[in-house]
Amino acid sequence: MLILTKVNIYMLIIVLWLYGYNFIMSGSQCPMINDDRFTLKRKYQIDSVESTMKMDKKRTKFQNRAKMVKEINQTIRAAQTHYETLKLGYIKFKKMIRTTTLEDITTSIPNIQKIYKLFSDISAIGKVSQNPSKMAYALLLYMFPNLFGDDHRFILYRMFPMSKIKHKIFSPFKLNLIRILVEERFYNNECRSNKWRIIGTQVDKMLIAESDKYTIDARYRLRPIYRIKGKSEEDTLFIKQMVDQCVTSQELVEKVLKILFRDLFKSGEYKAYRYDDDVENGFIGLDKLKLNIVHDIVEPCMPVRRPVAKILCKEMVNKYFENPLHIIGKNLQECIDFVSE
């Protein structure tokens, strides 16, 4: 009978440890470790690369979102300063209108006739308003007519959105003017920020209720930005930057047309133009080189085949020249009727 002494026990432990070590390190004892046949290890190596790519994509996505939210917050902060300056300017303008005639100030203020028309229209809306929230909504209709067109892009806008990623904010600078007008009509030119926020929240509820009646038609939808490709990398980058500012293809068309045909819209001559010559109806054809630029920018962004995109793009160009919605004042009666109900 073997008597285990402390020395024997220590020797036994050392022998067993060496045997186990040799067994693990020996390729013949563990053939799965062979690199040529270790498919599991290879699989994990591939997954790690894919995982890294996914993480990079997520990181880029969140960085872009963070950048967008930061820019929105900066705009909101700038709008607060703008509100105070605009209010002082509005009060001075009202005093000037009361003490002088339009003829007297025509030479001193550029575009005074347009400003006077705007002032006259918004005053007419304010006079018949009985509710601050309805007045604010009516002024949104008046100041953002292009958002309430056939593409229903207003669906994606809010005054105080719960999510700055999901919804866009109406121009804070135009909202400042609306706030000043509401304050003047209902609050004797005084309205604290929390009260204005309550009014904005009520307007957002009205927008939500109206949004439930509509959807953005497929023809007005845009491709995801990562799927947009131009003729070159430079073109692709430029188009993506344009699309990033739009929510529908109609809005993209409008943005490009206002850049390329700015003089026509500024002078009012746009009324005489259409996509093609139309002698019978007295319309002049638009510059074909500029129209080609419109197609090159818009078509890659539409989620349809190029031939279909070309037809739709042409229709949107004609539609916009028939009724350019960015020109405010055309829907004055609609706004007055809304607040009068």
From Swiss-Prot:
GO terms for molecular function: DNA binding. It is a single-pass membrane protein. The chain crosses the membrane at residues 7-25. Keywords: Early protein, Host cytoplasm, Host nucleus, Host-virus interaction, Inhibition of host innate immune response by virus, Inhibition of host RLR pathway by virus, Membrane, Repeat, Transmembrane, Transmembrane helix, Viral immunoevasion. It holds the Pfam family BEN. GO terms for biological process: symbiont-mediated suppression of host innate immune response. Induction: Expressed in the early phase of the viral replicative cycle. One of its GO terms (cellular component) is host cell cytoplasm. Residues 112-222, 233-328 form the BEN domain. Major early protein present in virus factories. The presence of BEN domains suggests a possible role in organization of viral DNA during replication or transcription. Plays an essential role in the inhibition of the cGAS-dependent type I IFN induction in host dendritic cells. Mechanistically, abolishes cGAMP production by triggering host CGAS degradation via a proteasome-dependent mechanism. Belongs to the orthopoxvirus OPG067 family. This is Protein OPG067.
